[in-house]
Amino acid sequence: MKHSVHFGAGNIGRGFIGEILFKNGFHIDFVDVNNQIIHALNEKGKYEIEIAQKGQSRIEVTNVAGINSKEHPEQVIEAIQKTDIITTAIGPNILPFIAELLAKGIEARRVAGNTQVLDVMACENMIGGSQFLYQEVKKYLSPEGLTFADNYIGFPNAAVDRIVPAQSHEDSLFVVVEPFNEWVVETKRLKNPDLRLKDVHYEEDLEPFIERKLFSVNSGHATSAYIGAHYGAKTILEALQNPNIKSRIESVLAEIRSLLIAKWNFDKKELENYHKVIIERFENPFIVDEVSRVARTPIRKLGYNERFIRPIRELKELSLSYKNLLKTVGYAFDYRDVNDEESIRLGELLAKQLVKDVVIQVTGLDDQELIEQIVEYI
């Protein structure tokens, strides 16, 4: 049986990446620091996924195990030494924390003389995630390890898309996911092109697909949350049931479409259909997706290269409309949740400093005209 190492045994890891790896015949070693999840994986050796749609069918994922990377790093290194593929779903901010362990695993392959080519795919909500991870891993590799990695270890970027809401069940491994999923891998950085996963798309140039996903799904989802929160909605479905909010989300997606078409020459009709499907996904009555989950960490989401500021910058450069995105940015700056550290910090910054200074600090912008435009909406 083929072997995989997956960093991140959370809902997305189990409910999306784990399902695909299982369907492709892999044994999966989930690596995490959550002892409860790791213990359950080792005790049961399987878990169930429920598809959030009419009929609510279930998939049993078997041949799984767990490794606590904090308590047993040597087991992770041993697994990496022998594995056929490595994936992650831990969040962009956590990638640097697994780099040293990954480097040790690569060094172990080198010392063992394992020259079987291996690909490492960071399945995160970020542009260039795998290459970012590689830059972090390189900091811990010896000169010999660097040469070995360049020859035998690939870090192809990936774009992933599936809504997996925050949830809690008596069975800690059980996870509910939406029916839709998309996983796209760039081919130009693959070291093992012969290992093709079914239900995964492969593209020579991944950037258009990553931007289509991030600027459509992530921007649209966050827009639903921030506008929804402003109007008192508790879930994304509740937000979409308000015609005013839905209309605003559609207006944001129309601006995103104009950017994607101008930049990547996407077919207008196909992109309209893609965005229509996104709205339908947000309206899935079988998913309870809390506004608080989607809106959390607003400081990160208002970053220079993130889901709002980047498309706004690029639309401005192309002299295209971004008014609706600006309005959403205003709602994001106004968002407060006592349980979200970043939203509280944002409120404190706005209370202590000039709004303009906070906008510059949070967004990283130096375009004075754009800064002033954002200030008008806060």
UniProtKB/Swiss-Prot annotation:
It is an enzyme of class 1 (oxidoreductase). Keywords: NAD, Oxidoreductase. One of its GO terms (molecular function) is mannitol-1-phosphate 5-dehydrogenase activity. One of its GO terms (cellular component) is cytosol. One of its GO terms (biological process) is mannitol catabolic process. Belongs to the mannitol dehydrogenase family. This is Mannitol-1-phosphate 5-dehydrogenase. It comes from Streptococcus pneumoniae serotype 2 (strain D39 / NCTC 7466).
